[in-house]
């Protein structure tokens, strides 16, 4: 099994991880409902790409 010959320093470790960060979610304006929502998701009112694909009052329980 391979084992590192030397301990990785804090600077080396942190500089390697420097590009790893959180990104803001892609929000888009939904003209049908007049609200902002996440991309590629059904809106809370049940609309997707301008068409109603789910009922607003229907709630699913995954118990």
From Swiss-Prot:
Keywords: Ribonucleoprotein, Ribosomal protein. Residues 1-25, 42-63 are annotated as: Disordered. Residues 54-63 have a biased composition (Polar residues). InterPro entries: Ribosomal_bL32, Ribosomal_bL32_bact, Ribosomal_zn-bd. One of its GO terms (molecular function) is structural constituent of ribosome. One of its GO terms (cellular component) is large ribosomal subunit. One of its GO terms (biological process) is translation. Belongs to the bacterial ribosomal protein bL32 family. This is Large ribosomal subunit protein bL32. Residues 7-20 have a biased composition (Basic residues). Pfam families: Ribosomal_L32p. SUPFAM superfamilies: Zn-binding ribosomal proteins. The keyword Ribonucleoprotein applies. Coiled coil: none annotated. The keyword Iron does not apply.
